[in-house]
Each structure stands twice: as C-alpha cells, then as structure tokens.
C-alpha cells in the first residue's frame, strides 16, 4: 500500500519533497494536498462490464455520473498525470452517447444508460480540450472521439427528444431543455415524480 501511494504522489505536478526551510503553514498545506491526492484516487474505479475505468460520483451509493465524472476529470486524472486512465474515462463517457447526449448515469438495477443531463455533453468538450492541453494527444481524440463531438453539435442544433428531455438550440442561440417535470440540470431532485426546483427552459449555467 505504501508503494502504491508513493507512485500516486510521484506522478503529480506537486512537489512533495522534504525541504528544510518549509514554514509550518507550508508543511500543513502540503500534507493537506497529499491527503487530497491520495483520497482522490479512490474515486477512480474499474467497470468490468465496459472493461474500462470510470469515475465514481460518491460513496457509498453513487455510481458514475456523466456530469460529476467530467467536472472532476481534470483534478483526478490530469493534475495527477494519470493520462492512460484519463483516456479510459473519456472512452467510458462516449461509449453510450445517444442522439448527442452523454449518459448522466446508469441504472443500478440493469445498467441501462440514463439521459437526464443537458450539460454532460457540453462538459465533455471542455474536458477533452483540457486533455489535449495536458497531453498534446490529438491522435487519440481524432481516432476515438472527434466524430462523436460532431454528432453532439449536430443533435443539439437539430434538437433532441429522449425521455422528454426536449433539448435544442433556440433561435436566439441559447440551449433550451426539458419540461416542467424534467430535471436535466444538477438540481435534479423530485418528490412523487414532481420537480422540486423546476429548471426547464434556458438554465443560466448551461448557456
């Protein structure tokens, strides 16, 4: 276990070497960052059904969620220089794209992809750009992902209707999504099938 942790810390961009002239605050900060790097590694999990790695949204009951996985992608995999795992996670994210939508998650009962997210596909673009910035690996993106990015753009412009998501680019070039009881943003709580905070239309963080 000590060897595994040492390897995790060695790969990061952060200097964890022992220095004589460190202040007490610097030592505390370094120890905090070290603990965060080690803890972050526990959220990277292998999905046997995909034969690929993914990012778990939260223990003990959350599986991988497209939105959460992509938001945490840079910190968990790029800052820590886990570039091979980063490629696997990107392949996991694009594996079940349907009509331009990255799955927001998978059913815990039958592993069925769930498409209740308007922003996961948009976050994918952002994280792929970051992957390229860190690695310069255009070849991987061009070979495995580029055509899927094109399809996302085409479908958002044309309009998407899966499970009443009703996502489309409006005439004012803002993205509209959902119905009164469709929850496609991070505020996705429902009680008895009714949205607690209806956010259909043009949510500010999506545009």
Where are the predicted features?
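Acidic, mature catalytic/reactive cores of soluble proteins
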Residues: 1-207
């Amino acid at each position: 276990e000590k060897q595994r942790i040492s390897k995790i810390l060695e790969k990061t961009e952060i200097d964890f070497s022992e220095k004589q002239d460190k202040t007490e605050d610097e030592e505390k900060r370094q120890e905090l960052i070290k603990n965060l790097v080690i803890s972050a590694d526990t959220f990277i999990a292998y999905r046997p059904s995909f034969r690929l790695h993914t990012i778990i949204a939260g223990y003990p009951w959350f599986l991988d969620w497209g939105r959460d996985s992509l938001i945490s992608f840079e910190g968990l995999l790029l800052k820590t220089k886990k570039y091979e795992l980063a490629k696997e996670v990107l392949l996991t994210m694009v594996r079940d794209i349907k009509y331009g939508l990255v799955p927001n998650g998978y059913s815990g009962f039958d592993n069925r992809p769930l498409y209740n997210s308007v922003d996961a596909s948009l976050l994918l673009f952002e994280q792929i750009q970051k992957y390229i910035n860190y690695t310069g690996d255009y070849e991987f993106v061009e070979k495995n992902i580029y055509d899927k990015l094109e399809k996302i753009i085409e479908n958002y412009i044309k309009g998407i209707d899966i499970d009443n998501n009703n996502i489309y680019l409006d005439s004012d070039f803002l993205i509209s999504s959902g119905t009164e009881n469709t929850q496609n943003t991070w505020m996705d709580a429902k009680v008895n099938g009714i949205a607690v905070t209806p956010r259909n239309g043009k949510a500010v963080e999506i545009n």
